[in-house]
Amino acid sequence: MEKLEGYSEKPKSRQQYFVYPLLFQEYIYAFAHDYGLNGSEPVEIFGCNNKKFSSLLVKRLIIRMYQQNFWINSVNHPNQDRLLDHSNYFYSDFYSQILSEGFAIVVEIPFSLGELFCPEEKQIPKFQNLQSIHSIFPFLEDKFLHLHYLSHIEIPYPIHLEILVQLLEYRIQDVPSLHLLRFFLNYYSNWNSLITSMKSIFLLKKENKRLFRFLYNSYVSEYEFFLLFLRKQSSCLRLTSSGTFLERIHFSRKMEHLGVMYPGFFRKTIWFFMDPLMHYVRYQGKAILASKGTLLLKKKWKSYLVNFSQYFFSFWIQPQRICLNQLTNSCFDFLGYLSSVPINTLLVRNQMLENSFLIDTRMKKFDTTVPAIPLIGSLSKAQFCTGSGHPISKPVWTDLSDSDILDRFGRICRNLFHYHSGSSKKRTLYRLKYILRLSCARTLARKHKSTVRTFMQRLGSVFLEEFFTEEEQVFSLMFTKTTHFSFHGSHSERIWYLDIIRINDLVNPLILN
């Protein structure tokens, strides 16, 4: 435990002290209102078209924030429209939101500087298109075929928002900025409860996305920081366990002797003393730990996670939230795909002179499929089909032009195929394509007050070309015109596109739920 505390003290040498004065710079709030730093998503704040911030206004806002009556008034009168009440100009939620967005940008600066001045030997080598979501799947294809056990972890939210402030003290030692952060968090927790409910966290997530993302990423980075420490300690344990024996050669000879007496004993016992490499992948508030070790090793890691979360983050992870599964017998939902590693049996008949024999070959394969029912449910919520998958028209779009309707339906279809291009089986995708194509035809037929058959005959191939996906164009280049190839077959070629940096809108609600 002393080593762990010393390990957590190391980053304090890179702490930044002068963050608070940046809150009085006007360009900070121009970033908050516009596109932010590094081209991030714009902050959507209502009613800020004709408003301008100055350093004097920011100073007055901060002074008012330190008066408790402002926050108590906000809690006792939550339904009061302070945005339109010009007498309560400084009390408005609008300006507190602007200030919190500016604060979120300011506190991001020390972390950006820490990445710039990182030693060269510790820098991660830059890899093109590493930000792509699809770049994770080739890694899983390469590694998961050689692993045995898989653990699913739901990263919990902090019980108290004060924990987030304490975690930032490792990186920022600017006391006024930390006090200001406490005022923001106490505002969202309503000053009432000692234990912050999930409602307060979701309120912060909804009203101030940038500040919530920064706090959550800081929290998760500390979580992974200590997880890395445990991983390094497990590697040292492997070397220590080997060094406890006086002579490794005699130990190996002894194990070989036991292996002769008890077939299979040598390999299993050696793995008991080794701590294999642990693979870690985080996504959407969840994490995956995969290893080649034994079930005993996975239980040891489970105990590690429960204990260090209770000690450093002051919350109790329920052991049942960490699921231990054998990789070959489990199927896990990962970024809109149902992934699994099944074992395929292949019988090979060999003929040697007059003797013939069968060889039973078992091969692992990383399989990714598209879940049909959840995606049909997403299309149903978007009013493209019924709950059972029957296509219907979309009356909201009947006021648009024909080209706009075709473009919208075709773009949705292409985006679905583009995101799920790594699926092993395309049958579900072609079912979704059929739903969108027929829904588009019904919408156009409803607009022109005609039947679907008549409208399809009038458009012909122009209507079909709108739903010709990018993946089908790639496959059309792979086969000559003389070769008969059906795009509606069950081909299993997978394509991972490295330009996808966000989850498809129809897939994202499925993951969040």
UniProtKB/Swiss-Prot annotation:
One of its GO terms (molecular function) is RNA binding. It is found in: Plastid, Chloroplast. Its main location: plastid. GO terms for cellular component: chloroplast. InterPro entries: Domain_X, Maturase_MatK, Maturase_MatK_N. Keywords: Chloroplast, mRNA processing, Plastid, RNA-binding, tRNA processing. Coiled coil: none annotated. GO terms for biological process: mRNA processing; RNA splicing; tRNA processing. Belongs to the intron maturase 2 family. MatK subfamily. Usually encoded in the trnK tRNA gene intron. Probably assists in splicing its own and other chloroplast group II introns. This is Maturase K.
